[in-house]
Amino acid sequence: MIMRPTPDMAMLLAAGLFALGLLGVLVRRNLLFMLMSIEIMLNAAALAFVAAGTRWHAAEGQVMFLMILSLAAAEAAIGLAILLRMHQAGRPTLDADTGNRLKG
């Protein structure tokens, strides 16, 4: 017997991915890993919206997925620009606690 994926299974997967991303943001101090964890959290939220839209036969879940996808792209671009600026400023570390020293 083959089990077919259901929206409930997708919601459980989204909750697990979100928890994993949240754990990564709270535990890691490296900005690159924090950005990757935020991306995991955004993808989990997008999966939850698609699963909810599938469950209730609504197209809003897919619309929200596209909105989250564009938000994730903007977040990645801004985050990587900040990381590049920190590297150009001569900071050898990507520790989140040194980010308050950015100027200009």
Swiss-Prot record:
Keywords linked to the UniProt accession: Cell inner membrane, Cell membrane, Membrane, NAD, Quinone, Translocase, Transmembrane, Transmembrane helix, Transport, Ubiquinone
Topology versus the membrane: Multi-pass membrane protein
Its biological purpose: NDH-1 shuttles electrons from NADH, via FMN and iron-sulfur (Fe-S) centers, to quinones in the respiratory chain. The immediate electron acceptor for the enzyme in this species is believed to be ubiquinone. Couples the redox reaction to proton translocation (for every two electrons transferred, four hydrogen ions are translocated across the cytoplasmic membrane), and thus conserves the redox energy in a proton gradient.
GO cellular component, one term: NADH dehydrogenase complex
Keyword NAD tagged: yes
Catalytic activity annotation: a quinone + NADH + 5 H(+)(in) = a quinol + NAD(+) + 4 H(+)(out)
Oligomeric and partner information: NDH-1 is composed of 14 different subunits. Subunits NuoA, H, J, K, L, M, N constitute the membrane sector of the complex.
GO molecular function: NADH:ubiquinone reductase (non-electrogenic) activity; quinone binding
Gene: nuoK
Listed InterPro entries: NADH_UbQ_OxRdtase_chain4L/K, NUOK/Mnh_C1-like
Major subcellular location class: membrane
Subcellular location: Cell inner membrane
Organism name: Gluconacetobacter diazotrophicus (strain ATCC 49037 / DSM 5601 / CCUG 37298 / CIP 103539 / LMG 7603 / PAl5)
Family, similarity comment: Belongs to the complex I subunit 4L family.
Transmembrane segments: 7-27, 31-51, 63-83
GO BP annotations, alphabetical order: ATP synthesis coupled electron transport
Protein name: NADH-quinone oxidoreductase subunit K
HAMAP family: NDH1_NuoK
EC number of the protein: 7.1.1.-
